[in-house]
Regions:
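Compositionally biased, charged N-terminal/linker segments
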Residues: 12-16, 35, 46, 243-244
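Short coil/turn linker and secondary-structure boundary residues
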Residues: 16, 24-27, 150, 224-227, ...
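Acyl-donor binding region in acyl/amide transferases
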Residues: 22-33, 37-53, 58-195, 204
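C-terminal functional segments of enzyme domains
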Residues: 201
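Short, intrinsically disordered, charge-balanced linker/junction segments flanking boundaries
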Residues: 222-253
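Short, cationic low-complexity segments
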Residues: 205-233
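Conserved N-terminal entry element of GNAT/NAT acetyltransferase domains
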Residues: 1-26
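Active-site- or DNA-interface-adjacent structural scaffold in DNA-acting proteins
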Residues: 2-3, 197, 206-208
């Protein structure tokens, strides 16, 4: 991991006042990936589904990196916080985003408030940027914090709310989870004052109704009763002749 960036000629108030948070350009993505892989404890910059990458910079110097991606599919504390139904979650989950990567490149002792400032500036513009890139707004955000490594102070200072910790499972396939026994802090934040009311409303308001998605059709299920299901091997043994010539001694099974 690289050493924290030092700013010997700048005070924290000066840096925070002139801090700029913006989406990275396509040409900057390789550098962003490299720095995230170098500084983030997960050691990779992979983002799932719809996503946006940001940099917080001061006079052209990259001080922090933020990555947003699709939210978790099933998250009981978050779903309880919102108060939506399973059907509403399926149709509106894309209106949430997950702060999947957050790296501070500058010395946190020199700039202790950089993280919360960068986070606040980023969430202030996230919905508009998301709509420009992905065609719909973001109403609320979530993030997981490894409590064994971090305290979540930046999220608290930026106005986020901590819910109960996760149960220590990680998704390893489309809808398959395994226990890793490392529960995470769950932090959430509504980007609009009425975001939760909108997400759990029977109908979205007219200006948001066009963003509601139709749930996918149910997966086809086998309609053959269990008693009628037989082994494919048994069928093949009855149909296909054995090409081997009987030789040697036969032994009973």
């Amino acid at each position: 991991m690289s050493s924290p960036l030092q700013l010997p000629n700048a005070s924290e108030p000066q840096v925070l006042e002139h801090l700029v948070v913006r989406p990275i350009t396509e040409d900057e993505r390789p550098l962003w990936n490299t720095k995230v892989a170098d500084h983030h404890y997960l050691k990779n910059a992979t983002l799932v589904g719809e996503h946006l990458c940001y940099v917080a910079e001061y006079q052209g110097l990259w001080l922090a990196l933020l990555g947003w991606s699709a939210p978790a599919r099933h998250l009981r504390p978050r779903d309880t916080w919102i108060g939506w139904s399973k059907e509403q979650r399926a149709a509106r989950r894309h209106l949430l985003a997950n702060n999947a990567r957050f790296c501070i490149l500058a010395d946190p002792h020199q700039l202790p408030n950089l993280a919360s400032r960068a986070l606040a500036l980023c969430t202030a513009r996230l919905s508009a940027d998301w709509q420009e890139r992905w065609g719909h707004p973001i109403l609320a955000v979530e993030s997981f914090v490894d409590g064994q490594l971090f305290r979540g102070t930046a999220y608290k200072a930026a106005g986020w709310q901590r819910l109960e910790d996760t149960r220590g499972f990680g998704r390893v396939a489309e809808d398959f989870y395994v226990r890793h026994d490392r529960p995470k802090q769950l932090w959430v934040c509504a980007l609009e004052a009425n975001a939760l009311e909108v997400l759990r409303a029977p109908q979205l308001p007219p200006e948001l109704a066009r963003f509601e998605r139709q749930p996918p059709p149910p997966r086809p299920r086998c309609r053959v009763p269990t008693g009628r299901l037989v082994s494919l091997l048994d069928i093949l043994l009855d149909v296909l002749p054995d090409p081997r010539h009987p030789k040697g001694r036969w032994h009973p099974w």
